[in-house]
Amino acid sequence: MSSVLRLFKIGAPVPNVRVHQLDASLLDAELVDLLKNQLFKGFTNFHPEFRDKYESELVLALKLILFKLTVWDHAITYGGKLQNLKFIDSRHSSKLQIQPSVIQKLGYGILVVGGGYLWSKIEGYLLARSEDDVATDGTSVRGASAARGALKVANFASLLYSAATLGNFVAFLYTGRYATVIMRLLRIRLVPSQRTSSRQVSYEFQNRQLVWNAFTEFLIFILPLLQLPKLKRRIERKLQSLNVTRVGNVEEASEGELAHLPQKTCAICFRDEEEQEGGGGASHYSTDVTNPYQADCGHVYCYVCLVTKLAQGDGDGWNCYRCAKQVQKMKPWVDVDEAAVVGAAEMHEKVDVIEHAEDNEQEEEEFDDDDEDSNFQLMKD
């Protein structure tokens, strides 16, 4: 093991807390993501196409600002400051804790901030050129083949960098000196800002997180059982009944809020269109009843509107907009007065009976006349 360490020039372990260094890098990444999301939200209603076109440049500018305010000015990142860490020049003794030189800071900014941006642009360019093979003169075809070759080299370089990152991470876990490959190349590392500070473990955040997780799980379990729309409808009906009781007027209680609409107008369509137009009123012509169906309260609505309201009621019914009564059932509306039909039928039956009686009386009178004529003739003979 010692021969392998000497081969890679890995020194002896130092008493640095590895977890703090890894947490510092994670905090820095989360800070960049948080600021990036806030920056992009600013372009939601103001030239969103600019954000989509220059997304990588905006992220680069954000990282440059953070680099200037942290590493360049104070030789530490925000995540490192939260973990009580700072950068030092490892070429000198760790007891001196000399800050990195200007060259080291500049190299850190170029490699960390600008390196990712340049590499993404190079890969995007090579990928776009490798697919450009539609020209007929052969120029673009040759350029595409060269781009594909360069893309393979870039992929191989990415593979080598990933392997180097893995090897450096294993070495970091052993020595605790250099958390990244770039820090190893520049010979800068993280050390505690105050050596006399003791590690204080606070469980306040963990306890708060556990409480919120338990509360969230409880809500996720209980909310589907509450049936909030159904509960809301019951409360609304209860409030309506209280208002009716407070008014104490039977005539007003028997009328709904849209009782003034004509019979041919669907009150549900009228209400929906009025809400869409912001309360400015709806046209009676555009809300006429289509495929009329009759509620059990007697008022007529569109079939689709009535079915939708009853389905939303989930078995609790729905309050009619015209009479404020609870609607539970519906049936097809027939534009025929059954009472009038029954009355007409009874009238026809009475007329038939009267006509039949008159015919019988007329026949009896004719029969009597015939009998009198026959008797008179017999007496004459």
From Swiss-Prot:
Domain of life assignment: Eukaryota
Pathway participation: Protein modification; protein ubiquitination
Family annotation (SUPFAM superfamilies): RING/U-box
Principal localisation: membrane
Binding residues for Zn(2+) 2: 297, 299, 320, 323
Transmembrane segments: 18-44, 51-76, 101-127, 141-175, 203-226
Peroxisomal matrix-side segments: 1-17, 77-100, 176-202
Enzyme class: transferase
Residues annotated for Zn(2+) 1 binding in this entry: 266, 269, 302, 305
Zinc finger (RING-type): 266-324
Positions in coiled-coil regions: none
Entry membrane topology: Multi-pass membrane protein
EC number: 2.3.2.36
Any one biological process term the GO annotation gives: protein import into peroxisome matrix, receptor recycling
GO cellular component: peroxisomal membrane
GO molecular function: transferase activity; zinc ion binding
Protein task: E3 ubiquitin-protein ligase component of a retrotranslocation channel required for peroxisome organization by mediating export of the PEX5 receptor from peroxisomes to the cytosol, thereby promoting PEX5 recycling. The retrotranslocation channel is composed of PEX2, PEX10 and PEX12; each subunit contributing transmembrane segments that coassemble into an open channel that specifically allows the passage of PEX5 through the peroxisomal membrane. PEX2 also regulates peroxisome organization by acting as a E3 ubiquitin-protein ligase.
Subunit structure as annotated in this protein's UniProt entry: Component of the PEX2-PEX10-PEX12 retrotranslocation channel, composed of PEX2, PEX10 and PEX12.
Family according to the record: Belongs to the pex2/pex10/pex12 family.
Record remark on domains: The three subunits of the retrotranslocation channel (PEX2, PEX10 and PEX12) coassemble in the membrane into a channel with an open 10 Angstrom pore. The RING-type zinc-fingers that catalyze PEX5 receptor ubiquitination are positioned above the pore on the cytosolic side of the complex.
The protein's name: Peroxisomal biogenesis factor 2
Lineage: Eukaryota, Fungi, Dikarya, Ascomycota, Saccharomycotina
